[in-house]
UniProtKB/Swiss-Prot annotation:
Catalyzes the reversible phosphorylation of UMP to UDP. This is Uridylate kinase. The gene is pyrH. It catalyses: UMP + ATP = UDP + ADP. Inhibited by UTP. UMP binds at G51, D71, C132, G133, N134, P135, F136, F137, T138, T139. The keyword Transferase applies.
Length: 237
């Protein structure tokens, strides 16, 4: 099966590439080229981007910052990534709009659900920045929320690994990859795919998740076409 409307979740770490911090312009351009091909084929695409390559709220709070304050700083980091991604996409010929959950009128549109859907219908990519606008919620939860709001067929979680494993494959070469899982299995086994709030939202709204390696060129296209890559999580597995 192929998908007509997709929510792509990009972690901030994915934008780092092999760098220890910040944004790798080559990675941004590679992602932009893949997105361009998908959009040209008629798929509607929205993106939620994280901010962990610049600042992570949980780390800030563990270092003594007030948790809500740290989360707001993390939200600003996601906006920086969103604007950078917009620049890369538009240089690749993809008409793009950034919408933020916290109003920043000089640099982005405020998040308005109906406007976001209208942009998608016109063939524009919509990049959501600022998380969901509230502290204590991750960008994974934002992905599940926005996917439900825009009636996305699926969430693509683009990561540094080629799927979901029972252990970290970088530390444990013998780690076993899951081809498919149910939401209930992810919750009961506490498998680290997304936080439990995000998984529960996807479960309740019947939005499948496909986890795959973003650094493999063409993987976004393959996932949109319904090819079997990475790991799939759904109500039925």
């Amino acid at each position: 099966m192929s998908y007509s409307r997709v929510l792509l979740k990009l972690s901030g770490e994915a934008l780092m590439g092999s760098k220890p911090y910040g944004i790798d312009p080559e990675i941004v351009q590679s992602i932009a080229q893949d997105v361009s091909k998908v959009v040209q084929e008629g798929t509607q695409l929205a993106i939620v981007v994280g901010g962990g390559n610049i600042f992570r709220g949980l780390k800030g709070s563990s270092a003594g910052m007030d948790r809500a304050t740290a989360d707001y700083v993390g939200m600003l980091a996601t906006v920086m990534n969103a604007i950078t991604l917009q620049d890369g996409l538009e240089r690749a010929g993809v008409e793009t709009r950034v919408q933020t959950a916290i109003e920043m009128q000089q640099i982005a549109e405020p998040y308005i659900r109906r406007r976001a859907i209208r942009h998608l219908e016109k063939g524009r990519v919509v990049v959501f920045g600022g998380g969901c606008g509230n502290p204590f919620f991750t960008t994974d939860t934002t992905s599940a929320l926005r996917a439900a709001e825009i009636n996305a067929d699926v969430i693509f979680k683009a990561t540094k690994v080629d799927g979901v494993y029972n252990q970290d494959p970088k530390e444990y070469p013998e780690a076993i990859k899951y081809e498919s899982l149910t939401f209930q299995e992810v919750l009961s086994k506490e498998i680290a795919v997304m936080d439990s709030t995000a998984i529960a939202l996807c479960k309740d709204n019947k939005i499948p998740i496909v986890v795959f390696n973003i650094f493999q060129p063409g993987n976004i296209n393959k996932a949109v076409a319904g090819e079997k890559i990475g790991s799939r999580i759904s109500n039925s597995g």
